[in-house]
């Protein structure tokens, strides 16, 4: 991931992560209008930061729902002022990051701390140290540190993913796989997550490439994506019927 070339007339990139090993496109697995119209209905709010949150009611149970579409900046106390009470009174949490292309790695690791009660190794990375193909440093641990003020580590949580969960969102997924209260539901994530580096060629074109490589706690690289604990596909027919199969699976799991 994070490999592209930028010229004055075109940007070149590799988007093969959207195609599976059989040459088929991964399903979209996301429709925000279906979520707002059929699940949240009028019980949701979108913050200026772009965070959408609300409540989903099912069979007498109430679950908090949060959609986060990008890790461009840290959550503010104003965000938490409205979101924390919704999470606290809910019986469980659906944290949806489908179609999240990433953003700040620091923001991702900070937010992951909401789901841990103690400092936890969530993966490893190795830094590129030379020109050779295998010139990398020794593996260095990556940690998630628990949030003191906003901790949801005791809240049963479903993390929703699809193939368009990329970069920092992929790293966030890797982190939450280590949280005891979190289950990943949906499709395999899109991969990526390494720190992009830049270099200008003599002709002025810009090349972007990863400066490190990321691994999970089993020391398996995550550049090709992270498999969900519960794999679910939402079809076009599902969405046309006002149904999100991934949310439905998450609700079933929350009610167990």
Mark where each language-model region is.
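Flexible, low-complexity junctional segments that flank or bridge functional domains
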Residues: 1-123, 156, 200
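Terminal peptide-recognition signature
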Residues: 66, 95, 157, 176, ...
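Active-site-proximal beta-strand/loop segments in catalytic clefts of secreted hydrolases
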Residues: 67-71, 96-100, 125-128, 160-164, ...
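Extracytoplasmic/secreted proteins, especially bacterial periplasmic and envelope-associated proteins
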Residues: 78, 82, 106-110, 167, ...
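Extended C-terminal subregions enriched in glycine
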Residues: 156-178, 183-190
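C-terminal soluble interaction/assembly domains
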Residues: 177, 186-202, 207-209, 228-232
């Amino acid at each position: 991931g994070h490999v592209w070339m930028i010229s004055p007339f075109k940007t070149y990139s590799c988007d093969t992560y959207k195609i599976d090993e059989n040459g088929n496109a991964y399903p979209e697995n996301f429709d925000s209008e279906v979520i707002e119209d059929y699940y949240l209905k009028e019980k949701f709010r979108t913050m200026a930061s772009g965070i959408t949150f609300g409540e989903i009611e099912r069979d007498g149970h109430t679950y908090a729902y949060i959609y986060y579409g990008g890790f461009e900046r840290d959550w503010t106390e104003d965000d938490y002022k409205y979101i924390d009470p919704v999470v606290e009174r809910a019986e469980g949490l659906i944290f949806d990051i489908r179609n999240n292309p990433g953003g700040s790695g620091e923001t991702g690791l900070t937010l992951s701390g909401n789901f841990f009660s103690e400092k936890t190794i969530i993966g490893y990375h190795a830094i590129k140290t030379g020109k050779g193909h295998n010139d990398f440093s020794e593996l260095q641990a990556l940690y998630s540190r628990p949030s003191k003020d906003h901790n949801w580590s005791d809240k049963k949580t479903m993390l929703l993913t699809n193939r368009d969960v990329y970069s920092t969102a992929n790293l966030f997924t890797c982190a939450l796989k280590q949280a005891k209260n979190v289950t990943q539901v949906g499709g395999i994530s899109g991969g990526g997550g390494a720190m992009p580096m830049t270099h200008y060629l003599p002709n002025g074109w810009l090349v972007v490439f990863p400066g490190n490589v990321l691994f999970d706690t089993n020391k398996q690289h995550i550049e090709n994506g992270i498999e969900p604990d519960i794999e679910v596909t939402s079809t076009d027919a599902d969405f046309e019927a006002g149904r999100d199969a991934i949310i439905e699976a998450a609700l079933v799991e929350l009610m167990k």
